[in-house]
């Protein structure tokens, strides 16, 4: 369904098309592994009536340890603010890495609404629950110190990931996410990924929704779980 006239930036080319809604998560602005330029390219090429920022957009954990904020990260923030000013409805749903923003639920900043969760109605009338998903992660819920330890290891894999993909680019190979691969393998061994997906889908169904859009586990997915549409943004 075409987006309204005010839902795009004049400077953007929209070669990728316009959509009713776009969902992005786990950008981790403030880390060296953030793919800010790729995100800027995506946003310039795609516009939408609704833009859902489904958590971990800013990595507050890493910024507290070491400040890292290049111009490209600032450009992403400016792009999101400009998108809101141009008429796109932008909703920010904080995750565990940007949980500091949960202290501002119900407020708007530059036209961006901060909410704990949201419900998006699709063109065919289905109700999709939008939540980051960290509330369902046993690692976060049961042992937050373990999550912080895991975050240190995750930052290391991001650095390693950059070096590996530099080599892959020289070899003409496409981008590959080592961090997502390792997180998938480690958590799969502990049955976290499967348990997470099922738990989120069950919660969505229990609340009367037809599906759920989440992030958090850095594993892009779209599948049916016992009659409920489960969608994960990946990273």
Regions found by a protein language model. Give the residues of each.
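Residue-level marker for buried hydrophobic side chains located in beta-strands
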Residues: 21-23, 51-53, 129, 213
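Core catalytic region of metal-dependent phosphoesterases/phosphodiesterases
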Residues: 1, 15-20, 29-124
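Active-site-proximal loop/helix segment associated with metal-binding centers of metalloenzymes
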Residues: 131-196
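N-terminal short leaders/motifs
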Residues: 60-84, 167-172, 178-212
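Conserved beta-sheet core of the metallophosphoesterase superfamily
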Residues: 110-116, 129, 134, 138-148, ...
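Active-site glycine-centered loops adjacent to acidic/histidine catalytic or metal-binding residues
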Residues: 26, 55-56, 95, 132, ...
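Short histidine/acidic/glycine/proline-rich micro-motifs that form metal-
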Residues: 27-30, 136
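Intrinsically disordered, low-complexity, charge-rich segments with an acidic bias
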Residues: 4-13
């Amino acid at each position: 369904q075409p987006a309204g006239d005010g839902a795009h930036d004049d400077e953007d080319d929209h070669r990728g098309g316009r959509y009713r809604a776009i969902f992005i998560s786990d950008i981790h602005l403030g880390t060296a592994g953030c793919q800010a330029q790729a995100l800027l390219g995506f946003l310039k090429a795609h516009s939408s009536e609704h833009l859902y920022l489904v958590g971990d957009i800013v990595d507050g954990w890493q910024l507290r340890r070491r400040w890292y904020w290049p111009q490209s990260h600032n450009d992403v923030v400016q792009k999101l603010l400009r998108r809101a000013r141009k008429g796109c409805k932008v909703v920010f749903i904080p995750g565990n890495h940007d949980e500091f923003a949960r202290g501002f639920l119900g407020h708007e900043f530059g036209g961006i609404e901060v909410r704990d969760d949201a419900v998006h109605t699709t063109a065919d009338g289905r109700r999709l629950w939008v939540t980051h998903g960290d509330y369902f992660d046993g690692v976060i819920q049961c042992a937050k110190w373990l999550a912080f330890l895991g975050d240190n290891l995750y930052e290391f894999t991001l650095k390693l990931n950059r070096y590996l993909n530099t080599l892959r680019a020289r070899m003409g190979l496409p981008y590959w996410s080592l961090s997502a691969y390792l997180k998938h393998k480690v958590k799969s061994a502990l049955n976290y990924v499967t348990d997470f997906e099922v738990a989120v889908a069950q919660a969505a169904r229990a609340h009367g929704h037809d599906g759920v859009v989440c992030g958090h586990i850095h594993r892009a997915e779209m599948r049916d779980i016992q009659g409920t549409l489960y969608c994960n943004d990946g990273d």
